[in-house]
């Protein structure tokens, strides 16, 4: 199946968990992103608020481990949170500070 799974989101880094490492030595940083915006749905304005868990791997994990409270623009894809949970987690592939 060739379905797209692409996410682009501007959000606040609400919480940063301690960095950890895989057995292969890859840095893993779990964060919580908080997003608020007005969207148009069915011709009406709709206020959207959400928090979503997200994960950053590798060099970017090291760079963002002390950036709680920063607004960012992220791009990535949705995946299951763990082998035992089908709850979604945003897997971040690109992250940069949001300048508005």
From Swiss-Prot:
It comes from the Bacteria. One of its GO terms (cellular component) is primosome complex. SUPFAM superfamilies: Nucleic acid-binding proteins. GO terms for molecular function: single-stranded DNA binding. InterPro entries: NA-bd_OB-fold (IPR012340), Primosome_PriB/ssb (IPR000424), Prisomal_replication_PriB (IPR023646). Keywords: DNA replication, DNA-binding, Primosome. One of its GO terms (biological process) is DNA replication, synthesis of primer. Residues 1-99 form the SSB domain. Pfam families: SSB_1 (PF22657). Involved in the restart of stalled replication forks, which reloads the replicative helicase on sites other than the origin of replication; the PriA-PriB pathway is the major replication restart pathway. During primosome assembly it facilitates complex formation between PriA and DnaT on DNA; stabilizes PriA on DNA. Stimulates the DNA unwinding activity of PriA helicase. Homodimer. Interacts with PriA and DnaT. Component of the replication restart primosome. Primosome assembly occurs via a 'hand-off' mechanism. PriA binds to replication forks, subsequently PriB then DnaT bind; DnaT then displaces ssDNA to generate the helicase loading substrate. Belongs to the PriB family. NCBIfam families: PriB_gamma. This is Replication restart protein PriB. It comes from Neisseria meningitidis serogroup C (strain 053442). The lineage of its organism: Bacteria, Pseudomonadati, Pseudomonadota, Betaproteobacteria, Neisseriales.
